[in-house]
């Protein structure tokens, strides 16, 4: 347990299908913020970073873009439900799309304050 004055880092994992657009955009929003260590991954085999049991174990909280991503992670770890938040963001945005950024900021601010 951290002693008074120590920083507590929250490890956050963002997951989408291909780890190309949605999850990297979300990762960029929190990257560099004090108190967060952030990674992103995809559920598809060809993703730059593929979701794994190791990443699930690393994360304190996992934000998935769609329900299907939650189901894919449950195949890797049946107990992952307790860590997952489904954001409900469909796959029709490009990386750093202003609308995607706005939606992510809105949804993430409910968990982390202003993003």
Name these PLM-found stretches:
Residues 1-115:
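Short polar/charged helix/loop
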């Amino acid at each position: 347990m951290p002693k008074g004055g120590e920083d507590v880092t929250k490890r956050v994992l963002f997951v989408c299908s291909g780890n190309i657009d949605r999850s990297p955009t979300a990762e960029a929003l929190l990257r560099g913020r004090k108190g967060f260590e952030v990674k992103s991954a995809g559920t598809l085999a060809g993703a730059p970073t593929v979701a794994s049991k190791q990443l699930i174990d690393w994360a304190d909280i996992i934000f998935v873009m769609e329900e299907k991503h939650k189901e894919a992670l449950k195949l890797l770890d049946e107990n992952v439900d307790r860590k997952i938040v489904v954001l409900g963001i469909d796959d029709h945005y490009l990386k750093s799309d202003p609308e995607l950024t706005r939606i992510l900021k809105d949804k993430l601010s409910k968990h982390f304050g202003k993003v």
